[in-house]
A protein has these predicted regions:
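Non-catalytic, soluble scaffold/interaction modules
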Residues: 1-206
């Protein structure tokens, strides 16, 4: 109705899309804002091997890349940070399994190298900037690379709703009074500190 269409005259369409075989290559998520600091001039890209579900579930520590947006718009290649993730396993397509997917270990040599090239990092960052410019707000996006064709695809884009709501002129940091052994690492989804007991739930009835 916002576009003036009569709902009783609009016909439904069925879209048939070819599957992006990212299980044969890589996939990931990216943000047109730094999700840790709220810095708006950076694109954050995370990448893993196989289907992107493991990033969503937090099952795999991904590769992480930062690109400076203003310099990218000027035609330069401003990759300002690259970090190799562990990427010990991946999810791939399997027509014989009940869920049509299976888990596979990633070869040691592939774990130790970046899962996408600098050229692919810059292409994804360019798309992130274009998508943000189109929607006029920081965006949260998912992407996939087809292992058969080598092509990159944006498979989802939605507004980023956490850091984009913060005042960009204010940075609040929290720190622990005591330090301990680090048992897990990754990108944060918040800046505050929580505490409590850890309970291992082995069955839904518990």
């Amino acid at each position: 109705s916002d576009k003036g269409f009569d709902h009783f005259k609009v016909k439904l369409s069925i879209t048939v899309q070819k599957m992006v075989r990212s299980d044969l290559a890589t996939s990931g998520v990216m943000f047109s804002i730094d999700t840790e600091s709220g810095f708006r001039d950076a694109v954050l890209i995370n990448s893993i091997y196989g289907l992107g579900e493991y990033i969503v579930q937090g099952m795999v520590n991904p590769d992480e890349f930062y690109v400076h947006k203003p310099t990218l718009k000027q035609g330069f290649k401003p990759i300002i940070s690259k970090s190799v993730g562990l990427k010990r396993k991946k999810m791939v397509y399997d027509s014989k399994s009940k869920n049509n997917t299976k888990n596979m270990p990633v070869a040691k040599k592939d774990q130790a190298r970046f899962s996408i090239t600098d050229k692919e990092i810059l292409q994804l960052a360019t798309w992130a900037v274009q998508i943000e410019d189109h929607y006029k707000k920081p965006m949260d996006m998912e992407w996939a690379k087809d292992g058969r064709t080598g092509k990159l695809f944006i498979v989802q884009a939605r507004p980023e709703t956490v850091r984009s709501q913060d005042d960009p002129n204010v940075l609040i940091e929290y720190s622990l009074k005591e330090k301990g052994k680090i048992v897990a690492i990754g990108a944060s989804v918040g800046q505050k500190i929580g505490q409590g007991k850890v309970h291992i739930i082995k069955d839904a009835k518990n």
